[in-house]
């Protein structure tokens, strides 16, 4: 079987000027990074603000399993399929992180014949955006410690410094550290640590800012610490926002690449899908909507996390109105939700598929609560039987939703033409009545309970006393209008990853809350959330190397 990287390497790429021209972008508006990558200039983007927006299509998925659903692959395949049926289309994706690339995933640019290229460049350093975000974040961290060292004018309580440093790598040994050791000349000793770059609030801010002025304003709003009286200290208070914006100036410009079938693709930003909103940048999505008739994008994890945050955070912040949603499901993932162990997924089991469809049905119901019409994409694998596929189609038909078998991994855009036609029919039907789940003026506690009960079907929400008190303080301090960002396991509607299917009446614990004032949301932490991953026993890095011709191998 030909590997993803071999397929990508064999592809014939078009010059970036030709890809840009498909969206009406002039040569002078693109900033080339070699022959196969480019950025779009901010000056050109500013000229688009009065253009009408095209149609926005979200690709999301059922609850993810170790078996994999192929959301990015489907996003790419659908974009190519829409292009094949004559639509002017652009795709918007997140940038991959080096940490997972060398950890468990081994690459994240689609797969098979539904890929974005140049695959190895995208998965490795790309255009340097993550380096810029890491640098801006760590500049802020350095300025905090420097401020404390040189007199501490803002009276920062070093025990209550909230900001940790970041690195775009999985490294568990950096989670908890003591810094400032070695005597007075080397700083003030305190506990600290590192998070992975995609967990940085700077990343979330870059992905939600409208322009450079908004970016600088949001960076200044980051709450970095508290004083002894529990009053908040921001990045603006120590004068950090301007220099941080300078470091992010070029990174803020969207990146443009292409699929194997030359569909223009914006890959820009990549925030965590648990403690942040898990979507590509607002500026890339808005730019694509001003240039294309159809824009296909994705959100991290399953629809209970990714789609909810896409609707309640990104669409709310950006004034976006999605026209349709594509819910990706696989037969093997449905079997796992139906109770089949991973090592038995190859055998036909229609009963397990039917049982697992409870998870699919729950996501369909949830998407309907946002007023967005849905089509189900059955991402095809060779082990799928006709009877299993028919069971999913019948389940969806009984609920008034169309299910379409998609074979894009093997056939590219040709394998998604029927899906593209179904999506186009939904979009042109104009049936979307999008609305967020809750209003801005709902209290923070009520917002958390609304998501928990309406989307997760929790019977109750149990707040740690400290979390509830903190929410009340933020409500009084003027942060009550912010949306909430739920941080919980992606494997279940509950906080228990082992509770698959469609559980109801469970108890959702909220053990901690975090204020992301710059990004503009409040994080509710439900269960254990790791912001600096570790490498597995056999990391993907062990299989990545250069061959005799100097080409990268092992990136799947």
UniProtKB/Swiss-Prot annotation:
Spans traversing the lipid bilayer: none
Lineage start: Bacteria, Pseudomonadati, Pseudomonadota, Alphaproteobacteria, Maricaulales
EC number: 6.3.4.3
Residues where ATP binds: 65-72
GO molecular function: ATP binding; formate-tetrahydrofolate ligase activity
One BP term from GO: tetrahydrofolate interconversion
InterPro entries on file: Formate_THF_ligase, Formate_THF_ligase_CS, P-loop_NTPase
Superkingdom, taxonomy of origin: Bacteria
The name this protein goes by in its record: Formate--tetrahydrofolate ligase
Reaction(s) catalysed (UniProt annotation): (6S)-5,6,7,8-tetrahydrofolate + formate + ATP = (6R)-10-formyltetrahydrofolate + ADP + phosphate
The species this protein was found in: Maricaulis maris (strain MCS10) (Caulobacter maris)
A family per Pfam: FTHFS
NCBIfam families listed in its UniProt record: PRK13505.1
Pathway: One-carbon metabolism; tetrahydrofolate interconversion
Record family assignment: Belongs to the formate--tetrahydrofolate ligase family.
Keyword terms, alphabetized: ATP-binding, Ligase, Nucleotide-binding, One-carbon metabolism
């Amino acid at each position: 079987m030909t590997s993803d990287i071999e397929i990508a390497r064999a592809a014939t790429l078009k010059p970036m000027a030709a890809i840009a021209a498909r969206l009406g972008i002039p040569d002078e508006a693109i900033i080339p990074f070699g022959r196969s990558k480019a950025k779009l200039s901010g000056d050109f983007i500013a000229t688009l603000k009065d253009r009408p927006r095209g149609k926005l299509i979200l690709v999301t998925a059922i609850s993810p399993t170790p078996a994999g659903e192929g959301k990015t692959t489907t996003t790419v395949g659908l974009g190519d399929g829409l292009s094949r049926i004559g639509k002017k289309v652009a795709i918007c994706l997140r940038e991959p992180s080096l940490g997972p690339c060398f950890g468990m995933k081994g690459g994240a640019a689609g797969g098979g014949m539904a890929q974005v290229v140049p695959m190895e460049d995208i998965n490795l350093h790309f255009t340097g955006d993550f380096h810029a975000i890491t640098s801006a974040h760590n500049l802020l961290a350095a300025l905090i410690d420097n401020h404390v060292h040189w007199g501490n004018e803002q009276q920062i309580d070093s025990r209550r410094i909230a900001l940790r440093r970041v690195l775009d790598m999985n490294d568990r040994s950096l989670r908890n550290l003591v810094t400032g050791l070695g005597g007075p000349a080397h700083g003030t000793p305190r506990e600290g640590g590192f998070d992975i770059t995609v967990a940085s609030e700077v990343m979330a801010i870059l992905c939600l800012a409208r322009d450079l002025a908004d970016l600088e304003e949001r960076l200044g709003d980051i709450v970095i610490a508290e004083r002894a009286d529990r009053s908040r200290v921001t990045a603006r208070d120590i004068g950090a926002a301007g220099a941080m914006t300078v470091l992010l100036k070029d990174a803020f410009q969207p990146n443009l690449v292409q699929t194997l079938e030359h569909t223009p693709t914006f890959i820009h930003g990549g925030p965590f899908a648990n403690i942040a909103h898990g979507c590509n940048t607002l500026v890339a999505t808005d730019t694509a909507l001003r240039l294309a008739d159809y824009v296909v994008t994705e959100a991290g994890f399953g629809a209970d996390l990714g789609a909810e945050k896409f609707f309640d955070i990104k669409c709310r912040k950006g004034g976006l109105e999605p026209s349709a949603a594509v819910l990706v499901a696989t037969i093997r993932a449905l079997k796992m939700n139906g109770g089949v162990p991973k090592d038995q997924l190859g055998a036909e089991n229609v009963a397990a598929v039917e049982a697992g469809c409870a998870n699919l049905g729950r996501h369909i119901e949830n998407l309907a609560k946002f007023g967005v019409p849905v089509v189900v994409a059955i991402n095809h694998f060779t082990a799928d039987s006709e009877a299993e596929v028919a069971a999913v189609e019948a389940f969806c038909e009984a609920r008034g939703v169309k299910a379409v078998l998609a074979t894009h991994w093997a056939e590219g855009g040709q394998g998604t033409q029927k899906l593209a036609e179904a999506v186009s029919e939904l979009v042109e039907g104009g049936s979307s009545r999008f609305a967020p789940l809750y209003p801005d003026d709902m209290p923070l506690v009520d917002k958390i309970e609304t998501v928990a009960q309406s989307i997760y079907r929790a019977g109750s929400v149990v707040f740690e006393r400290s979390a509830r008190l903190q929410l009340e303080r933020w409500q009084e301090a003027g942060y009550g209008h912010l949306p909430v960002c739920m941080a919980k396991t992606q494997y279940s509607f509950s906080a228990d990853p082992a509770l698959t299917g469609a559980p109801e009446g469970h108890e959702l614990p909220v053990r901690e809350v975090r204020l992301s004032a710059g990004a503009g949301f409040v994080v509710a932490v439900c269960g254990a959330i790791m912001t600096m991953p570790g490498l597995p026993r056999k990391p993907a890095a062990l299989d990545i190397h250069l061959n005799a011709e100097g080409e990268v191998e092992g990136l799947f």
